[in-house]
Design a protein with these regions (language model features):
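Short, amphipathic alpha-helical "recognition" segments used to contact nucleic acids or chromatin
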Residues: 1-13, 57-66
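Short alpha-helical "recognition helix" segments of helix-turn-helix
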Residues: 14-22, 75
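Mobile-element integrase/transposase regions
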Residues: 58, 66, 85-86, 90-146, ...
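C-terminal domain-tail junction helix/linker
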Residues: 203-205, 228-306
């Protein structure tokens, strides 16, 4: 510090110019200047509110072992909501990595297409799609309507046929469930959705219709992801022994999906919480639990240091 000040007095060159020549930022120089002559104060022993107690580490590890295949972020918010332990996703990640319990995660592919405007409120966009379901070698058809904002399944049916009339029936029943909704209907270019009868039906219901471009996940990927989730976590897990058995099992899974399953795209809340406007309450409760846990750890660390 003294040399720099002396050099400035001798040459008249501004300190910032000298610091630039030395490759040193002014903020770092003045930080050193404020500390000049003071003893070093290491912060390694200062209490951290993310230091976990042994029981918290054990709770995270035990919970992860009971939920194999579940990502660390999902585990974090599930543990928080169920009052198992209150930690951040980063803390859960560190604990699981230390114990060799992290699941491998594949990064999603990128698409060059952009421009689809996402909904800002419930019932602004309804996505509709048809997916094939095999029941003992025979195909039936899952027709589902999904709210694009909340990811809530507005209505679904497992039907024997997939005609335009079947699509109309499913959409009509979805509208009966939410009679005040006037969403924009988003679909692919399947024959049912481009037919004249379907256009007349939408005009009668006073609904706008948007057909998506192929390979464009921003527009209709939400309901395609729903179909994949149902097949992966329900249909391929439990065999379906008939149409009624399939309707019962798929219906039970969709109820779980809407009311109990945390969704990564909506702040790890359930679709129903977002649809019904309860998201703020749940997020505030999580913040309260995390702050209480941090305060308790700080107090425990302070007692240990005495």
């Amino acid at each position: 510090m003294d040399r720099v000040e002396a050099l400035k007095e001798r040459t008249g060159v501004a300190i910032r110019t000298m610091l630039k020549a030395l490759g040193l930022s002014p903020s770092k120089f003045y930080q050193w200047k404020r500390r000049f002559g003071l003893p070093n104060r290491h912060n390694g022993k200062m209490p951290r509110d993310f230091w976990l107690e042994p029981w918290e580490v054990k709770a995270i590890v035990d919970y992860a072992r009971r939920r194999p295949g579940v990502g660390y972020r999902y585990l974090t918010y599930e543990m928080l909501d169920n009052d198992v332990v209150a930690v951040s996703p980063a803390t859960t990640y560190r604990v699981l990595k230390r114990h060799g319990l992290l699941n491998r995660w594949a990064s999603p592919g990128k698409t060059g297409k952009r421009g689809f405007e996402q909904p800002r409120r419930p019932h602004e966009h309804w996505h509709i799609d048809i997916s094939y379901v095999s029941i003992r070698g025979t195909f039936v058809f899952l027709i589902a309507v999904l709210d694009g904002y909340s990811r809530f399944v507005v209505h679904h049916e497992l039907r024997v046929h997939m005609t335009e009339r079947d699509v109309e029936i499913v959409l009509q029943r979805a509208l009966e469930r939410f009679p005040r909704a006037r969403p924009r209907i988003i679909s692919d270019n399947g024959s049912q959705f481009v037919s004249r009868d379907f256009k007349r039906f939408l005009a009668l219901m006073q609904l706008q219709h948007v057909r998506t471009s192929p390979y464009h996940p921003q527009s209709n990927g939400k309901i395609e992801a729903l179909a994949k989730t149902i097949k992966r976590d329900c249909i391929r897990v439990e065999p379906l022994f008939g149409l009624e058995d399939g309707r019962q099992k798929v219906g039970a899974f969709i109820h779980y999906y809407c009311y109990h399953r945390l969704h990564s795209a909506i702040w790890y809340l359930t679709p129903y919480e977002v649809l019904s406007g309860q998201a703020g309450k749940r997020l505030a409760e999580r913040d309260r639990k995390l702050e209480e846990a941090r305060r308790r750890r700080r107090e425990r660390t302070a007692v240990d240091r005495v």
